[in-house]
Amino acid sequence: MAPARCFSARLRTVFQGVGHWALSTWAGLKPSRLLPQRASPRLLSVGRADLAKHQELPGKKLLSEKKLKRYFVDYRRVLVCGGNGGAGASCFHSEPRKEFGGPDGGDGGNGGHVILRVDQQVKSLSSVLSRYQGFSGEDGGSKNCFGRSGAVLYIRVPVGTLVKEGGRVVADLSCVGDEYIAALGGAGGKGNRFFLANNNRAPVTCTPGQPGQQRVLHLELKTVAHAGMVGFPNAGKSSLLRAISNARPAVASYPFTTLKPHVGIVHYEGHLQIAVADIPGIIRGAHQNRGLGSAFLRHIERCRFLLFVVDLSQPEPWTQVDDLKYELEMYEKGLSARPHAIVANKIDLPEAQANLSQLRDHLGQEVIVLSALTGENLEQLLLHLKVLYDAYAEAELGQGRQPLRW
């Protein structure tokens, strides 16, 4: 019995050792291997600040006027190339038990045109590239298969785009839907079937496709609006546009704050919309390319009527109107004679009250006195703007044309 007891004691010792080793080994393992992984409570509990940070959409940063100027482009030099025509094929008909088949090479497809198309949703030439290549036509095939012609490539341009070539105006795209073929596609080549004749029953001649037309065009944008606000720098044109429309041009107390034209829409009853353009400030000698120069004077050409904005707080404000009309007349004959209204701004300033009576005496016409900052007398401007538009619309309908709609 002694050996049996000794064996059982040793066996018990071995089992105890194995048990201690198993417990120590399991304890040393990572919890992730033993238990299913659970999300950390920190990931599930989000504070109010963190929740707002994740839920709120990132707001769009307001661009300064200098940065906006990069997005508004009113001039582009464009190289347009029409698509090349496809080559004709030279092959013969092949059929069992027919040794001498006739020619069956098809013609190549024509190259695609490059066309300028006016799109009302486009407001600038910034999306126009400096080079365009039309789609080429496919080559002809056997069994009289003609190649597919290249698709037409459309270039979207804004309303009021002027197309020039070699200093000469070749197209004036002033209406929505207007199109102009900027470059013609090349003609497709002829297959050998085209050269089949009585004295040549097995022609092998085929011609390559013609290259597309290449042209260098200069695109100029002239902003199309019903009314154009004209004035000297810091006269309050941008503030006035912000007051009567939803446009948000930059406003500051220094001259030449506005570096590009802005167009605001004034809404009236009956879904009538009048477009008002804020033209950058004009100085004396602007027609000689001083200041911002004549680069922005051309935007006034398409305006149907004008609003001369005068800074009433400046000494002798009537001279501003005379100088503005002179600059417009020097730039283009008859531009200053368009229907217009005189808007005297900054009536809220003390020095403006003293100049009001003198301004009316010198001009001898109705003057709309208001303050774009405080909103004083803006209703009179809106009513007069409607009168100018009605006169313009009546004149257009009398000549059989539809008024410009935005």
From Swiss-Prot:
GO MF annotations in UniProt: GTP binding; GTPase activity; magnesium ion binding
Keywords: GTP-binding, Magnesium, Membrane, Metal-binding, Mitochondrion, Mitochondrion inner membrane, Nucleotide-binding, Ribosome biogenesis, Translation regulation
Highest taxon, organism lineage: Eukaryota
InterPro entries in the record: G_OBG, GTP-bd, GTP-bd_Obg/CgtA, GTP1_OBG_dom, GTP1_OBG_dom_sf, OBG_GTPase, P-loop_NTPase, Small_GTP-bd
Gene3D superfamilies, per the entry: GTP1/OBG domain, P-loop containing nucleotide triphosphate hydrolases
Gene Ontology terms: cellular component: mitochondrial inner membrane; mitochondrial matrix; mitochondrial ribosome; mitochondrion
Pfam families reported in the protein's UniProt record: GTP1_OBG, MMR_HSR1
GO biological process: mitochondrial large ribosomal subunit assembly; regulation of mitochondrial translation; regulation of respiratory system process
Domain OBG-type G: 225-390
Annotated Obg domain residues: 70-224
Cofactor(s) needed for function: Mg(2+)
Compartments, record wording: Mitochondrion; Mitochondrion inner membrane
PROSITE patterns the UniProt entry points to: G_OBG (PS51710), OBG (PS51883)
Stretches the record annotates as Localized in the mitochondria: 15-406
Binding site for GTP: 231-238, 256-260, 278-281, 345-348, 371-373
Membrane topology annotation: Peripheral membrane protein
Key word Membrane present: yes
Region (Not localized in the mitochondria): 30-406
Amino-acid positions noted as binding Mg(2+) in the UniProt annotation, renumbered to this chain: 238, 258
Record NCBIfam families: Obg_CgtA (TIGR02729), PRK12299.1 (NF008956), small_GTP (TIGR00231)
Subunit structure: Associates with the mitochondrial ribosome large subunit; the association occurs in a GTP-dependent manner.
Cited function: Plays a role in the regulation of the mitochondrial ribosome assembly and of translational activity. Displays GTPase activity. Involved in the ribosome maturation process.
Family to which the UniProt record says this protein belongs: Belongs to the TRAFAC class OBG-HflX-like GTPase superfamily. OBG GTPase family.
Entry protein name: Mitochondrial ribosome-associated GTPase 2
